[in-house]
């Protein structure tokens, strides 16, 4: 067993092409290798174990590196690990780190740095928003540690020497190596944390093991990173600098793109028809494992009443929002997007009915709950500051006022304070977006489990939890999908959230940017793969 796995994996790694900034022969490069990226807003953190959203993850993917990375086709490739063995029927992994790995300050990176990072993730003292991620990966004792029932040192990960990391799972997880590409499972510098403790993640203290290091952070304007000469593959990293711009308005991003000040930006909805005509070679529409929805807070009335939640769920014109208000989106009826591997979406007949019938159903539910024209439903709709999110919020509030007579107040915040408010439960109905951290429906559905850190609405359903727990025991994708479909039916019936649309990657990319991934549905962009052609 050991020999067969080892030989297969050695062959896999040795056959893997050299991906880092694979510049085609005879391609002239620009003298200034700087990539300027519209990243929407400032990240909430750059601490790998505390990352919870793509805004931060995009930067952390450049500053740090895990055991593996995801190539432009969405396939797992060796990163800090040069190879690995899968043993005991998929319950034990042995990762062999590359020789000579260093942190950006020149200190050696060892397997113990991975152990520390993973232990930090599950340690309740860290308060990682992704602590449950290791439990979802079924790493031994992770769930017990997160629940405060076991010590962090009992986590199923250990360094058998400086270059060898052994991971023990409670059960086989077919997509386990894919999960390793998310920042929660990145290493952290043991020597820096020993010196600075929780302050290690302040910019003046941080060190990095990724292709870039933090150079400058102008709050709410931009973050600049420069090439890391200590990176394991620095000789193949072409970019010298990356700028992550905090442009929270798609029109501003578009205007700066047209002015030549941004190389990659999101597309404003109202400009899509014109862009398709004027810049067809620069508009990129890439399938993406993303779901946009609104979360109810079940700890606050009126949304502790399923009848009220269902009334709002039924009266959303998803087609209008996805294709008219925003454009190029797909109306969502399930939390899990149809692009997820092996998932077949469930069709709900009630959402296929004419809006007039759905409104009648919704009004009946509200009447049962005690709401009518003399006592209208009142609530607050909460979203983070961004013009496209505002368009969606306005459309939703208008629909609910039109169909149900609801009085909806809009509330918006900057990204960081928005995240803090959601975590504190300071909302009634709030916007949420989820991008898969691995290609399986459980990446989406697990966010609603009773013990999930992402379940900010505090919905609890024992039947739902049992279905997902049962699904983790099944390796057959078809049988697992049947359980996922049952879970989606419960979401439809209980409405802890309202699916709105599925969003592909819709961006403008300058034609002189080379190496950009066009087929990775998880939207992992590694700047080490990019280069700027002469233009």
Curated annotation (Swiss-Prot):
PANTHER family reported in the protein's UniProt record: PERIPLASMIC BINDING COMPONENT OF ABC TRANSPORTER (PTHR30290), PERIPLASMIC OLIGOPEPTIDE-BINDING PROTEIN-RELATED (PTHR30290:SF10)
* Compartment(s) of residence: Periplasm
Q: What InterPro entries does this protein map onto?
A: Peptide/Ni-bd (IPR030678), SBP_5 (IPR039424), SBP_5_dom (IPR000914)
- Chief place where the protein resides: periplasm
UniProt keyword annotations, A-Z: Periplasm, Signal, Transport
What residue stretch is flagged as signal peptide? 1-20
Q: Which organism is it from?
A: Escherichia coli (strain K12)
Q: Which family does it belong to?
A: Belongs to the bacterial solute-binding protein 5 family.
Q: Which GO terms describe its molecular function?
A: peptide transmembrane transporter activity
Name of the featured protein = Probable deoxycholate-binding periplasmic protein YgiS
The induction annotation reads:
Repressed by the toxin-antitoxin system MqsR-MqsA; this mRNA is degraded by mRNA interferase MqsR.
Q: Which domain of life is it from?
A: Bacteria
The knockout note for this entry states: Cells grow better in the presence of the bile acid deoxycholate. Increased membrane stability when incubated for 2 hours in the presence of 4.5% deoxycholate. Increased cell survival in the presence of 20% deoxycholate.
UniProt record, GO biological process: bile acid and bile salt transport; peptide transport
Q: What does this protein do?
A: Probably part of a deoxycholate transport system. Its expression in the presence of deoxycholate in a ygiS deletion mutant increases intracellular deoxycholate levels and decreases cell growth; higher expression in the presence of deoxycholate inhibits cell growth completely. Bile acid detergents such as deoxycholate are important for host defense against bacterial growth in the gall bladder and duodenum.
Cellular component GO terms held in the UniProt record: ATP-binding cassette (ABC) transporter complex; outer membrane-bounded periplasmic space
């Amino acid at each position: 067993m050991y020999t067969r796995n080892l030989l297969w994996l050695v062959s896999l790694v040795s056959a893997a092409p050299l991906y880092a900034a694979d510049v085609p022969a005879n391609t002239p490069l620009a003298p200034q290798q700087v990539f300027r990226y519209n990243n929407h807003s400032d990240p909430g953190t750059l601490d790998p174990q505390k990352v919870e959203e793509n805004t931060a993850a995009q930067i952390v993917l450049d500053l740090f590196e895990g055991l593996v990375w995801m190539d432009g086709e969405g396939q797992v490739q060796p990163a800090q690990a040069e190879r690995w063995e899968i043993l005991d029927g998929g319950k034990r992994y042995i990762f062999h780190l590359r020789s000579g790995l260093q942190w950006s300050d020149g200190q050696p990176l060892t397997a113990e740095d991975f152990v520390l990072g993973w232990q930090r993730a599950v340690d309740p003292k860290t308060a990682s928003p992704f602590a449950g991620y290791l439990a979802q990966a079924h790493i031994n004792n992770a769930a017990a540690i997160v629940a405060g029932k076991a010590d962090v040192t009992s986590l199923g990960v250990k360094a058998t020497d400086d270059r060898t990391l052994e991971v023990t799972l409670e059960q086989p997880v077919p997509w386990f190596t894919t999960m390793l590409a998310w920042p929660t499972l990145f290493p952290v510098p043991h020597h820096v944390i020993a010196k600075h403790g929780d302050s290690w993640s302040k910019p003046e203290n941080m060190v990095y093991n990724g292709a870039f290091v933090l150079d400058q952070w102008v709050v709410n304007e931009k973050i600049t990173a420069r090439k890391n000469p200590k990176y394991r593959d620095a000789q193949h990293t072409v970019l010298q600098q990356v700028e992550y711009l905090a442009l929270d308005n798609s029109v501003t991003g578009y205007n700066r793109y047209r002015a030549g000040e941004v190389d990659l930006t999101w597309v404003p909805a109202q400009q899509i028809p014109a862009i398709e005509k004027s810049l067809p070679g620069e508009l990129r529409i890439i399938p993406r494992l993303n779901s946009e929805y609104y979360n109810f807070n079940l700890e606050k009335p009126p949304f502790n009443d399923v009848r009220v939640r269902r009334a709002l769920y039924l009266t959303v014109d998803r087609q209008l929002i996805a294709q008219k208000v925003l454009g190029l989106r797909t109306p969502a009826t399930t939390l899990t997007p149809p692009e997820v591997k092996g998932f077949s979406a469930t069709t709900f007949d009630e959402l296929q009915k004419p809006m007039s019938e759905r409104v009648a159903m919704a009004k009946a539910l509200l009447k049962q709950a005690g709401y009518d024209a003399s006592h209208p439903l009142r609530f607050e709709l909460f979203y983070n500051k961004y013009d496209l999110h505002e368009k969606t919020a306005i459309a939703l509030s208008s629909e609910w006022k039109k169909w149900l007579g609801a009085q909806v107040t809009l509330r918006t915040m900057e990204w960081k304070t928005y995240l803090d408010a959601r975590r504190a439960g300071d909302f009634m109905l709030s916007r949420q977006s989820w991008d898969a951290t691995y290609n399986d429906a459980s990446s989406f559905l697990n966010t609603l489990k009773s013990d999930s850190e992402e379940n900010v609405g505090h919905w609890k359903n024992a039947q739902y939890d049992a279905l997902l727990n049962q699904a983790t025991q099944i390796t057959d994708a078809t049988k697992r999908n049947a359980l996922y479909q049952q879970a989606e039916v419960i979401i439809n019936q209980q409405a802890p959230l309202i699916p709105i649309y599925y969003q592909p990657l819709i961006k403008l990319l300058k034609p002189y940017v080379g190496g950009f991934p066009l087929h990775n549905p998880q939207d992992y962009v590694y700047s080490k793969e990019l280069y700027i052609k002469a233009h």
